[in-house]
Amino acid sequence: MRPSCASSSSSSASPSLRLSSVTVAVDKATSELLRTPDWTIIIAICDSLNSNRWQCKDAIKAVKRRLQHKSSRVQLLTLTLLEAMLKNCGDFVHSHIAEKHLLEDMVKLVRKKGDFEVRNKLLILLDTWNEAFSGVACKHPHYNWAYQELKRCGVKFPQRSKEAPLMLEPPPPVTQSSSSSSMNLMSIGSFRRLDETMATEIESLSLSSLESMRNVMDLVNDMVQAVNPSDKSALKDELIVDLVEQCRSNQKKLIQMLTTTADEDVLARGLELNDSLQVVLARHDAIASGVSLPLLLQAPEPRETSSSLKTCGAAALESADSESSSSSSSSESETDEVEDVKDDFIQLAKRHALLNALHSDEEEETLLLGNDNEKTAEAEAKTQCKDLALFDTTTTTTTKSEQDIIELLSLTLSTTALPSPQTQPQTQHPSFFADDNILMNSYVVPWAQSQEEPQVPKMTQFAPSGPQFQPWPLQQQQPYSYGYPQPQWSGGQVNSNDTTFWSQGGNENMVFERNLQVSNSFPARATGTSGAATAATVDRQP
């Protein structure tokens, strides 16, 4: 009959915790890593038992198993959970506790004389339950039996505090019509008592557990500092894992305490402890994830006094202000230097612009004196220069200071001294001895070397595609003296006008004014077929 009722109740109500999750919830609520009770899980367990009574059996089994744990911390957390279940659940929980021999296990723990806190907690609970369930119409005599058994053994129960809430007595029988309203009132009363219990726990935490939290944090910090940052496996040690989990749970409880406390001293210490916990946990997480440790994740120094903290904070603020002022002054000095440099560039540019304006008239006059050929040559040269120095349109935009430097350099190059033009225009003619027409590279005697070409008039072409030649004026030719003595048989100067050469491709005679080499004077031989060859005659005296 019981399983059928359980199945019907489970089908009608939606359970907040499944059958398998009740045991897991009990294990979490009594974890060895917890320093104080986790009331969120405890409330969830009580709600699940009130909505699904068939889960009470599994919950009591899990509590009995956790009560046999070797750790005194686990035993204390288990007793706290058991007390909350008796206060916030109905008669079905009281019956299961009495039937599952849980009270006998509690008596055995008292007789063992183990941990003092655990033994004291057991005696207080048994004394409270005996007072709550005693009377003429006692439904659960097991609680009275446990109390009397310890009394016969000579155990002295501690004096209970008058402010401690008494055990919730079983509700009187009510009719079915008013069952829903009475259940609501009972749940409201139970939650009020639960809130009072949580408030007392949080208040005791705020006054007594800050130092223990700091000790655990310092221990974790020392272990994390001793670990090699490149070795992740060192953080998998069981002791380090337990301490880190304890720090995380302490941080959660600390945040809850800070939201409810009104003491300024406790609030200041709690905030400081919270910051230190965040730094230590962040350092641990950085090493565990293999991320490089930031400079800010340094070990928190131990707290000395509130006055030392205030002085350190004031010194930090002063150093931050000095750094900010120095950085602002350095930035202002840099901007002033940049502005001074820009002003110098602007002044230089204006100076060069004035110089260009002064010399612009002279340059225009000299440029207007050039002939058409010079203009054509200059145009070709400019086009060649433009072809060589192509403008890169993909050049990135420079800053304002770089543009000023470029403009200054361009002004400096534009103001360089130009070569003075000739007073008379000179016509460019291709020469017979031009570099483009020389076909061989031979030695040239000194008297045949190229001299400074004077202005020559335009001469006729002796071939359709050949270069043009014209005799040079005699009045502009200056004789060249080589310092050689005249021969004995030479009676006078060599007549340069009698020296004549016959051109190869034309019928015109081309006369060159030069000093002849006397020792190698031979008559020229005719090479053409169109006319008779004329020998070059030289006046010499024997």
Curated annotation (Swiss-Prot):
Gene Ontology MF: a single term: phosphatidylinositol binding
Region Disordered: start-end pairs: 303-340, 522-542
Topology term for the membrane: Peripheral membrane protein
InterPro entries associated with the record: ENTH_VHS, GAT_dom, GAT_sf, TOL_plant, VHS_dom
Tissue: Preferentially expressed in flowers.
Keywords of the record: Membrane, Phosphoprotein, Protein transport, Transport
Protein function: Might contribute to the loading of the ESCRT machinery.
Name recorded for this polypeptide: TOM1-like protein 7
Organism: Arabidopsis thaliana
Protein's gene: TOL7
